[in-house]
């Protein structure tokens, strides 16, 4: 139930934020995403802090797989402060089939998937040519993630991504790095990397 509520909050907030773009420049997604290259496991390198990931202290990953109905299955996992892993399953549908770079995601149960407000924008706004990293955002600029195929990213690449994101209207000052390779001991976080 908690996962449903957190997923519902994300989708509702993203839906509301898409109406509140204000004077931001129009956000553009990348010209093309090859879905079979995008599938698989991604490590969260950094993000805008958000309510539905508040319990996560590190080791955050997102795994995408193709479903028979053409949609994508999402599995987001993270380490919590108590040392347990939290997992949230979701689904994505392609919103722009010409580019595959604009998706709609939901973590709400399937039986309410007919409601438009349970689906949130998930746009690939930056992508390495070799698919070693991807940057996710949405038109309201309320959500932002940097994902990579490896748990660490060199600082030069990270800074270049932040500069490009800033030119798109995102705020680098809001971005927080996500620790990978961490453990928890008695409620504290120990970074092993």
Summary of predicted features, one role per range:
Residues 1-4:
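Positively charged n-region of N-terminal signal peptides that target proteins for export
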Residues 7, 16-193:
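A beta-rich soluble binding module of mature secreted/lumenal proteins
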């Amino acid at each position: 139930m908690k996962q449903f509520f957190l997923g519902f909050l994300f989708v509702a907030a993203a839906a509301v934020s898409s109406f509140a773009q204000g004077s931001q420049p129009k956000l553009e997604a990348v010209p093309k995403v090859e879905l079979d290259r995008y599938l698989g496991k991604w490590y969260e390198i950094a993000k805008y802090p958000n309510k539905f990931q508040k319990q996560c202290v590190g080791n955050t990953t997102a795994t995408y797989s193709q479903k028979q109905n053409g949609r994508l299955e999402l599995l987001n996992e993270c380490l919590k402060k108590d040392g347990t892993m939290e997992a949230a399953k979701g689904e994505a549908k392609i919103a722009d089939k010409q580019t595959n770079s604009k998706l709609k995601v939901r973590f709400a149960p399937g039986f309410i998937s007919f409601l438009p407000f349970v689906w949130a924008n998930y746009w690939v706004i930056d992508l390495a040519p070799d698919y070693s990293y991807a940057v996710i955002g949405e038109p309201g600029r309320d959500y932002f993630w940097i994902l990579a195929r490896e748990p660490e990213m060199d600082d030069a690449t990270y800074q270049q991504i932040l500069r490009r994101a800033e030119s798109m209207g995102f705020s680098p000052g809001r971005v927080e790095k996500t620790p990978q390779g961490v453990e928890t001991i008695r409620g504290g976080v120990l970074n092993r990397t």
